[in-house]
From Swiss-Prot:
Alphabetic keyword roster: Ribonucleoprotein, Ribosomal protein, RNA-binding, rRNA-binding
Signal peptide extent: none
Gene designation: rpl14
Cysteine-cysteine disulfides: none
Protein name, entry field: Large ribosomal subunit protein uL14
Amino acid sequence: MKAITSNVSKSLPIGARLKCIDNTGAREVEIISVKGFKGVRRRLASAGVGDMVVISVKKGTADMRREVTTAVVVRQKKEYRRADGLRVKFEDNAAVIITEDGVLKGSEIRGPIAKEAADLWPAIGSAASIIV
């Protein structure tokens, strides 16, 4: 896995609801845990752009609802700073559902995604129409 190119603020704690922007049938998902998070006692795990999270599907088609799976955060409202000094923020928090080995479950991604997520996850970068 490639190193992330900016210092992304981890602004999505456990329990945060995100918009699902692929065509898997899920519309809204909730973060259950963050993969690879090493924290302090009693501190909620938090995720940012490019992080793999375990999610529960809250809204969507009947066969997708209540399913527990993995996803990657591709947009966040909280601004973060890139190495060149540019500050990036999006109008919503969004994720894309993937398998454990990083393969997209859907075939298309709606809306823009962050460059950091596209660099870390090549499958997401190739399926995205707009990379910011």
